[in-house]
């Protein structure tokens, strides 16, 4: 009830119709390393600061009544980083689940993971499994973590699955359409059909998508902010949501 009241106050304050709020917001959390360099601390300390920023954005998204929040936590390309940094990132994930899962569950948040989890450390897999099983029946904010995720890999995986069904006779070649491809993406049937993102935010001043939700982002609105991720505040997030609500989305129609 408190979250509903806060969302109402937000809409009244910004003269925003609830129907104009994004249903699904995706975030490319960029800038942890540069934040660490700027503050003369380790890259792992930067990732920890980024984790703290993420916690606050989750809370604000829930308060504003956003139904889906997806964060780009670890890409398939991030394995190129040092073993120490990669291990530290997954260690932070385990720490985050251990410290925050109880509160997430109490707030009716449902956790989902998008990506190939076979390669990640066992301790991280165990933490993820616990988060999924604990929050699986919740129906509040859907918090999706893109982990060992790459959109090209995701699309190729969907293509292999569809080809396998055609070869086995389960479906005809002419049945492969946009809906069929979408069904076999990580955002498809296996995760309850997460809707395409209405808004994608990238921090740190970089203006690119970086292999993130390429299929799903066909008609997404894009916002790029100069703030390094650990500096990205709930108030800035809220302002971006307000700015989005003033946009006129055309979906290629005119």
Where are these regions (language model features)?
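Flexible, compositionally biased loop and terminal segments
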Residues: 2-254
